[in-house]
Amino acid sequence: MFDTESVFVKAWDYVGDRLGIGPAGFMVIETLGMNLEVTKQKWRERFGGKCDEAEVERMTYEYIDDYYANNHVPVKKGLKTILDYLKGHRYRIAVASSSPENVVKAHLKDADIDKYFDVIMCGDMVAKSKPEPDIYIEAATKLKLPTSECYAFEDSESGLKAALASGCRTIMVPDLWQPDDVMRQKV
């Protein structure tokens, strides 16, 4: 729904430069659709003891908070058109995001699309986040629908894996990450 990835690329380039490890924006592709704990793990694997994890997190959120204090969340083209269509035809709509609840709700409100959603599921609301299917299964349960009757729009590998494993019909939304031939055949 949102192009938050481009903001994180800038943030992690800034953080990496400040901490002396060099631009780290490339890590966004490696962590797309993953919750904070998995993202931290990926950073540990990549950089080991080269930087303080708490400092990376603090600086990242400082950069992100400053960005959003001065800019609206970037909305992907066509989002409101799709949401208007779905609501106009009385579809029930859920968000299933790996991001924390406070971040998701702030972005939905900032983009003035919070009113479209019947259910909001976030990475900090489930025991296992994407690529595990839990978030989609829980969203479908709250919508009172079997996952086989739900469509999932995804732009990350971990999100696609989660949606497919849950039994949702899955639609790939091209973004920074591009699926390989095996993943393309599944969606």
What spans do the regions from the language model cover?
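Asp-based phosphoryl-transfer active-site loop
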Residues: 1-6
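A short, Lys/Arg-enriched amphipathic alpha-helix followed by its capping loop at the start of a domain
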Residues: 14-19, 81-91
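Helix-loop "lid/cap" segments that line or gate small-molecule binding pockets
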Residues: 15-16, 35-50, 107, 139-140
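Asp-based, Mg2+/Mn2+-dependent phosphohydrolase catalytic module
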Residues: 84-87, 100-187
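Short beta->alpha linker loops
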Residues: 7, 31-35, 59, 74-78, ...
